[in-house]
Amino acid sequence: MSILEKVQPIETMLPERYYTMSTEDMEKRVREIKEKMGETLFIPGHHYQKDEVVQFSDAAGDSLQLAQVAASNKEAKYIVFCGVHFMAETADMLTTDEQVVILPDMRAGCSMADMADIEQTERAWKELTKLFGDTMIPLTYVNSTAAIKAFCGRNGGATVTSSNAKQMVSWAFTQKERLVFLPDQHLGRNTAYDLGIPLDKMAVWDPHTDSLEYDGDIEEIQVILWKGHCSVHQNFTVKNIENVRKNHPDMNIIVHPECCYEVVAASDYAGSTKYIIDMIESAPSGSKWAIGTEMNLVNRIIQQHPDKEIVSLNPFMCPCLTMNRIDLPHLLWALETIERGEEINVISVDKQVTEEAVLALNRMLERV
């Protein structure tokens, strides 16, 4: 068991009966429990979740929106978080001690968040301090563990989302000369470049070799990027863009900034999940779009805008596998367990970690 979590030892695997229930019966039971529990139950759902789950969300949004919703909700006793592990951790840290945060399936993790563990990060900070002294401030994408957020908090740094990355990177440079950006190198690189920092003033820290990779003068380095990435957005390529340009020259290409620099540079637009949703929403009827982000969201956008021609930038994309672990059976299981007065898959972050991580989260939330 992780030192950051205290999971109730009741039943950790989905009981067999949920595999045999019909969709109609499961949906009926979820509605019954939601109605019965009223405001004591709150279900936030990330945009990348399946439709079968999102339909029951009390709030749907990207990571920033859900962080803000979690921080403002004081009424619900139970928060059943339909997202991935780091999001549930964030919800637990921003809510009161009396509120219980539950993740329907504990296997719903994030490969990007796992690419930066606290031991690697502490070691990297020590080595980088030897090179650059007290000139660095850490920023972490919210797609990171509570321990990494806490590291940033106690070292004067903050969290960022894809919605506010430019704002937070700009703030970071008012604090220190250099920025260490974890764990997604692509969001960090794309954001810094948009703010006018050339690529040769960026370096990449490889946590597996404990080495700094750079092309320019080491004294000129302003941004140190952690060598991590999103496994979903890594699958969008310049070749995908070339194919769209060739076969559909009048199609707009919009991607998430977790895509690599080359893909973002070759696209027409790049922005957060909310940015993509809003852009398509406001686009004229008949417009054509190729979207480079998670497939559940792309399919939902397609369904919501039948008046527009919308495709995935990569025709062979699949949904985020860890997000997809949260499904209707796991949601119902979590709710029925609460109904019986029991608790499963409780996310409870260590108190000291919470205090330090909240410093980083609040430095972000007070600026957005």
UniProtKB/Swiss-Prot annotation:
Chemical reaction(s) catalysed: iminosuccinate + dihydroxyacetone phosphate = quinolinate + phosphate + 2 H2O + H(+)
A cellular component annotation (GO) from this entry: cytosol
EC number: 2.5.1.72
Pfam family for this entry, one: NadA
One GO BP annotation of this record: 'de novo' NAD biosynthetic process from L-aspartate
Gene Ontology molecular functions: 4 iron, 4 sulfur cluster binding; metal ion binding; quinolinate synthetase A activity
Primary subcellular site in the record, as a coarse category: cytoplasm
Pathway involvement of the protein, from the record: Cofactor biosynthesis; NAD(+) biosynthesis; quinolinate from iminoaspartate: step 1/1
Keywords, sorted A to Z: 4Fe-4S, Cytoplasm, Iron, Iron-sulfur, Metal-binding, Pyridine nucleotide biosynthesis, Transferase
Residue numbers binding iminosuccinate: H46, S63, Y141, V142, N143, S162, H256, P257, E258, T273
Free-text comment on the cofactor: Binds 1 [4Fe-4S] cluster per subunit.
Needed co-factor(s): [4Fe-4S] cluster
Residues given in the record as [4Fe-4S] cluster binding sites: C110, C230, C320
InterPro entries assigned: NadA, NadA_sf, Quinolinate_synth_A_type3
Compartment(s): Cytoplasm
HAMAP family named in the record: NadA_type3 (MF_00569)
Its job: Catalyzes the condensation of iminoaspartate with dihydroxyacetone phosphate to form quinolinate.
Family the UniProt entry places it in: Belongs to the quinolinate synthase family. Type 3 subfamily.
Name of protein: Quinolinate synthase
Organism of this sequence: Bacillus cereus (strain AH187)
